[in-house]
Amino acid sequence: MRPAPRWTGRTDGTTDEHLRWHQVVAPYAPGAEPNSCVFVGFASDEGVRRNKGRVGAAAGPDALRQAMAPMALDRPRRAYDAGTVEVVGEALEEGQRALGGTVAGLLDAGHFPVVFGGGHEIAYGTYLGVAGSSRRAPGTRLGILNLDAHFDLRADPVPSSGTPFRQILAAEGDAVRYAVLGISQPSNTAALFDTAARFGVRHLPDDECDPATALAFVDAFLAEIDLVYLTIDLDVLPAAVAPGVSAPAAFGVPLPTLQAVCDRVSASGKLAVVDVAELNPGLDIDNRTARTAARLIHRIVTRHVPVPAG
């Protein structure tokens, strides 16, 4: 685990009305106040490389921290940074297991983990954490909501950024519900649609994601589960909004619709963990993608995590 970097940014004052994220995020240590947000980085693009994508997402966690650090807070917040799980060389599976252990430990300690990627291979590591935590008690119906242009259900010979949800569904069967909002038909072969149908995957195409339809899709999904893992692949957004990804979207889901979806999930009381995938700073334009991702995470955390007492 790489230690948490220092969050820095503009300081207008130290009283509550002046606070920004960089002034409230502290290094995480066991025994930290429960019911807090804990940020974790996952520095990996080995899965993207294996999936024949454009590498660079390993730099995503720190770029996301830098974009979020100067954002102003409406009220005082309590947050921690647990550092970054770093995938060294080709040791993706080892990194995913390490991420899973970190996420499980945070959940068991009563925290809300927010994981910064990294390629979408992050998803298998985050899932291992949820599956291995006490939050998933016997009989708990776990759901994964993926905001993504791709199913990520490939049957590749080795795990990659294109395989995590097939790995999960192959292991879990009907014990996990999986839904994808924002699917781009031209970016997924007929074979992938067949795989999705075989696994019972619900999906909503990007060109049908008006706010009302998107929220109805999410409501139906949430009604069937007890616990939700939300994963946001930034290539679900239009390329003009999120150019800094391996596979920019020609169409994409508008940001206001995605924000409404995230609000609905946050308000459900079922959200256990969220991660953000595929931020590639080397492909970004004026930090546009990083700032958009930071805005979404800011919104989710401030809506989901209670304000500390006193």
Curated annotation (Swiss-Prot):
Its EC number is 3.5.3.8. It comes from Nocardia farcinica (strain IFM 10152). The gene is hutG. Mn(2+) 2 binds at residues 148, 150, 233, 235. Binds 2 manganese ions per subunit. This is Formimidoylglutamase. SUPFAM superfamilies: Arginase/deacetylase. PANTHER family: ARGINASE/AGMATINASE, FORMIMIDOYLGLUTAMASE. Belongs to the arginase family. GO terms for molecular function: agmatinase activity; formimidoylglutamase activity; manganese ion binding. It catalyses: N-formimidoyl-L-glutamate + H2O = formamide + L-glutamate. Pathway: Amino-acid degradation; L-histidine degradation into L-glutamate; L-glutamate from N-formimidoyl-L-glutamate (hydrolase route): step 1/1. It holds the Pfam family Arginase.
